[in-house]
Amino acid sequence: MKRTRFYVTLVVLMVQQFSYAQFRKYSNEFLNIGAGARGLAMASAQVASVSDGTAGYWNPAGLVNVKDAPQLNLMHAEYFAGIGKYDYGSLAIPLKDNKRVLGLSLLRFAVDDIPNTVFLVEADGSINFSNIKTFSSADYAFLFSLAQPIKTTGKSKISAGVNAKIIHRKAGDMATAWGFGFDAGVQIVNNKWKIGIMARDVTTTFNAWSYSLSEKMREVFYYTGNDIPSKSTELTAPKLIVGGDYIFRLNKNLNLMAEANLDLTFDGRRNTVISSSVVSVDPKLGLEASWKNVFFVRGGINNFQRALDDNDITNTKKVWIYQPAVGAGFRLSNVLIDYAFTNLANQSNPLYTHVFSLRVDLVKKGNKK
């Protein structure tokens, strides 16, 4: 009886909390950038094939492939001519039974030196540039992952994984948010093909925002007709990612792997290939050619959208745009270095980004092969 009463109380509190919250289509967008140059070079088509420490981001079920020794992954990228800086790091640790794997991941996206022009205009209407101060806006995510195999049937192996994530967002000294959420994933692996399913923000991820504004700043907001922010809660709706890959063994040394993913969102119409009020579907396609599992060449395409044609002077014609990506990688003993080259759109003025990542298998000297 006490347990039933506890669950009822918990549900009531959750419903009450959600009633004051707002679902946003593009909440926590920094968590959609990606992890590792391999995944970015394949246009983020990773949910089925990922099998290293970056699986904590793409699909935690893939962490089961990290065996015998811990694995470290690091990545750095800069966007918009260096204005935005994105860093990712993860550590995958096989547990003593060599079946379950623990993953720890950290993501950070930040923009520094943002001008704060709140006090630019003096009370008499004059402009005082010396009143401009700068601040930084930074988003952090901490992912705690656990994965293990759950079933073997014939030639297929099934593994599952979960993420618990803590989110911290900060805009100078003015605004701070804390949030948490959960992800869950499954991988089915065969000799030539794999299937992956990832439920992101499966229980709905929320951010609780609080604001710290001085009285002088509130006064400026009031007299300039700006809303004075108050505490609020922001919700991120669940997303389902499904995908599959197939390996073409071209000869003894050369393999070609192709993967297709579908991102399914349920928060209303989006600018995607399939768009409806019930579900929107965003496809991603990736390829990876590998030679002796030492040298890799990759490519992919994603982010299909309808946008105004840059060459149309009437500003009415729409065309399909997309985001291509290419990359390469090579392995040297227990170290893997990957590179990706992406652009944010294929219009006349694309914004290109170079991404590098490093993977190190922390093998003990006595275990080196």
What are these regions (language model features)?
Residues 1-26, 287:
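Bacterial Sec-dependent N-terminal signal peptides
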Residues 22-369:
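Subset of outer-membrane beta-barrel
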